[in-house]
Amino acid sequence: FAMFGATVLVPILTGLDPGIALLTSGVGTLVYLLITKGQIPAYLGSSFAYIAPIIALNENSGVGSALVGGFLVGIVYALVAVFVKTVGTKAILRFLPPVVVGPVIMVIGLSLASTAVNMAMYEDSTAKVLVYSSTHLIIALITLGITIFCSVVLKNFLSLIPVLIGITGGYIASLFFGIVDFQPVIDAPWFQIPNFTVPFVDYTPQLTWEIILMMVPIAIVPISEHIGGQLVLGKIAGKNFVEKPGLHRSLFGDG
């Protein structure tokens, strides 16, 4: 539930289809569990690290360039997985120790602070003319307050889902402020096929230096984040997922 917001927010910010993001997120998670032999309890969602390059490629060259870039990143993950399998996990952990991985994860979150603030302060943070909204700011503060309270005060299972509780509280507050429009939900069909973008049908894949230079180098950021996530997840579960089923399997499945 906590990942749902992020998985939907990234395609909204980048101009992609949230329905496709949810579908591929689910399929990708199933593939990940298959590759890792079902031993790592993880869910794959959208990565915030690629927001800026995807927006740039989408605006300059179209959605096809962004999709080709995503495919290249998957190849990079596969190559790194082969490298880890060949040299061992100790070598990669020596190259990316916790003192490096930790700040990388922090930078990813902090780099999105301006986006969060803009969405909390303005009626439409993507508009050319920004209109300040005290209502949005109040709801954002209510959501943040509930999330912090639940994270600090609540115990057991509820302490694990403060983001979900915060989102729920913020949504209820939005209802009282009258800014929730149910009409799109009422008008939407019960079942609808997502708006797929098919290569060689909707666009012709082209490999350019622009795509390579904008997408491939950034792969080191989510790879570092992935390694940190595995170490933290292992601590929580009391297992060493880096050794079993192995970091190479986890990286390959993530890619």
Task: Outline where the language-model segments fall.
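Hydrophobic alpha-helical segments embedded in the membrane of multi-pass proteins
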Residues: F4-G5, I20-L30, S47-I51, I75, ...
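Juxtamembrane interface elements at the cytosolic ends of transmembrane helices
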Residues: F4-V8, T143-C150, I161, I172, ...
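Short, non-helical or kinked segments that cap or interrupt transmembrane helices
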Residues: L16-L23, G38-Y50, I92-V101, L158-I165
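Membrane-embedded alpha-helical modules
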Residues: E59-P184
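N-terminal signal-anchor module of multipass membrane proteins
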Residues: F1-P41, A49-E59
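Membrane-embedded helical hairpins/re-entrant loop segments and their flanking transmembrane helices
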Residues: G15-L33, M214-G255
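Hydrophobic, membrane-embedded alpha-helices of multi-pass small-molecule transporters
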Residues: F1-M3, Y132-L144, I161, T197-G229, ...
